[in-house]
């Protein structure tokens, strides 16, 4: 009888021990809670991985997160003596843990054109792709973000509807470019920098700028130490021969309408004023960032020369320029239309070479969706279809999948997608797995393969217009943390949209 009573007394104790063990060392699959912002029930925990990308290299170890901040990063050999209190441990094993991606070039089309994308679907796609912060472009929404009043509309549209952190670029257009007080009021309202087009944007309330507008914009930005992003193409007269080769369903017909000389001419003009951004120059403190570079020849040579002279200039390219080539684009498949255009395979190789050597600074998605009917997929008319590639959810596996043959490393991916974008956008609390930074983290399995099809949930609004449909990719995102909240894990999103607006304050 006494033995039986002892057994009954021990059972609750054993159950408690088992429960505590399960609580402290649970696998990611078992985490559930009542916090609607997060799939985790608490805000203090450790994340362990055999592959953690830190500023000091790749380590096997653990990251402690508390209150949305990284409070310690320790190597595996030091972890047990560093763990002062018993808190939950999430062990991801061989999966890679690295800073969340920061995508500085996204069109979410909200407010005004949310039928193209919208904050909810776009930021869900970002979370599912390991993007923890994105910066929304000032055009394709309506109205365009060119004043404090239009920025306020965008801020209101984003509230309680974003699943990751979001910042905004403002627009540099002729109406505000020569009015320093107008630009200052837009910058004071919180945009992270400005964006302009040197060719028609295709959006009526976002007209193109000339080099005078850009020079004046840089002089204002110098006071704020924020960047100017420029779509660098200048229209020139074209000589296109008549004939069947100019069939609008042929991608080569479209390619001829936007030759490399357009990019080269725009960049040459830009670099005539960026000397002012050098140390001691009249626009010192300003910075020029060339978006979505497509031409890897003369345009890139000009940029390299300007950098060598001390101009404050950076340049990005996009996954679609690194993944595709003009030769492989099927007739009438307007999903591949964008501007600048995807160029030939030799150009693609040069882009990879420049990226690997550091001449191209970073990557961005330039996620630019629209309604499927504007893609004219049934007609296949490249000359009339809306230009833009939908890729937001897949930029990490695309970069990894197509980069493997070039020897891309995890540290390089982190530099291109986290570290350098954080510096460009002035998001200094983000971009690295280090103490004091936001706990913006992505966990992913580089070796895991998947097909971009109906069996793999796609969260941006119009999957049918993505050029990546049917592609097999390597690199599956397992979990995404935004300021400590597990916003995406094991294929599920947290129920509430608790992303934070990233507005400039100084």
From Swiss-Prot:
GO terms for cellular component: endoplasmic reticulum. GO terms for molecular function: allantoinase activity; cobalt ion binding; zinc ion binding. It is an enzyme of class 3 (hydrolase). Its cofactor is Zn(2+). The gene is ALN. This is Allantoinase. It comes from Arabidopsis thaliana. Belongs to the metallo-dependent hydrolases superfamily. Allantoinase family. Keywords: Hydrolase, Metal-binding, Purine metabolism, Zinc. Disruption phenotype: No visible phenotype under normal growth conditions, but mutant plants are unable to grow on a medium containing allantoin as the sole nitrogen source, accumulate allantoin and have increased tolerance to drought and osmotic stresses. Pfam families: ALN_composite, Amidohydro_1. Gene3D superfamilies: Metal-dependent hydrolases. Signal peptide: none annotated.
């Amino acid at each position: 009888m006494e033995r039986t009573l002892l057994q009954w007394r021990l059972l609750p104790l054993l159950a408690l021990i088992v429960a505590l063990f399960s609580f402290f060392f649970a696998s990611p699959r078992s985490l559930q809670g009542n916090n609607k912002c997060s799939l985790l029930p608490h805000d203090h925990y450790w994340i362990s991985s055999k592959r953690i990308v830190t500023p000091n290299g790749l380590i096997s170890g653990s990251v402690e997160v508390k209150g949305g901040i990284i409070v310690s990063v320790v190597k595996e050999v030091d972890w047990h003596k560093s763990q002062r209190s018993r808190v939950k441990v999430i062990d991801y094993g061989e999966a890679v843990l690295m800073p969340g991606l920061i995508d500085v070039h996204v069109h979410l089309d909200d407010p005004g054109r949310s039928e193209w994308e919208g904050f909810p679907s776009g930021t869900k796609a970002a979370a599912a792709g390991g993007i923890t912060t994105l910066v929304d472009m000032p055009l394709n929404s309506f109205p365009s973000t060119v004043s404090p009043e239009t920025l306020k509309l965008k801020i209101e549209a984003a509230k309680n509807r974003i699943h990751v952190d979001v910042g905004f670029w403002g627009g540099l257009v002729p109406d505000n470019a020569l009015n320093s007080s107008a630009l200052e009021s837009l910058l004071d309202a919180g945009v992270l920098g400005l964006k302009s087009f040197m060719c028609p944007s295709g959006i009526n309330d976002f007209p193109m700028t000339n080099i005078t507008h850009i020079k004046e914009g840089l002089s204002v930005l110098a006071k704020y130490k924020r960047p100017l992003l420029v779509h660098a193409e200048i229209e020139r007269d074209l000589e296109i021969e008549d004939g069947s080769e100019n069939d609008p369903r042929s991608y080569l017909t479209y390619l001829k309408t936007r030759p490399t000389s357009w990019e080269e001419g725009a960049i040459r003009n830009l670099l005539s004023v960026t000397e002012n951004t050098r140390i001691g120059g009249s626009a010192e403190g300003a910075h020029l960032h060339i978006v979505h570079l497509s031409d890897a020849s003369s345009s890139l040579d000009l940029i390299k020369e300007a950098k060598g002279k001390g101009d404050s200039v950076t340049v990005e390219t996009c996954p679609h320029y690194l993944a595709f080539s003009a030769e492989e684009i099927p007739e009438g498949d307007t999903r591949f239309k964008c501007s600048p255009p995807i160029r030939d395979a030799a150009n693609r190789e040069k882009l990879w070479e420049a990226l690997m050597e550091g001449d191209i600074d970073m990557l961005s998605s330039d996620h630019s969706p629209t309604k499927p009917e504007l893609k004219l997929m049934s007609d296949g008319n490249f000359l009339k279809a809306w230009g833009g590639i939908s890729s937001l959810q897949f930029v990490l596996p695309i970069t990894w999948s197509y980069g493997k043959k070039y020897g891309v490393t995890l540290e390089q991916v982190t530099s291109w997608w986290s570290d350098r974008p954080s510096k460009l956008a002035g998001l200094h609390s983000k971009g690295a797995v280090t103490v004091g930074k936001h706990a913006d983290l992505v966990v992913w399995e580089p070796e895991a393969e998947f097909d971009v099809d109906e069996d793999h949930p796609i969260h941006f609004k119009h999957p049918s217009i993505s050029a990546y449909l049917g592609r097999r990719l390597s690199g599956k995102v397992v979990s995404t943390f935004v300021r400590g909240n597990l916003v995406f894990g094991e294929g599920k999103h947290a129920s509430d949209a608790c992303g934070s607006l990233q507005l400039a304050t100084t």
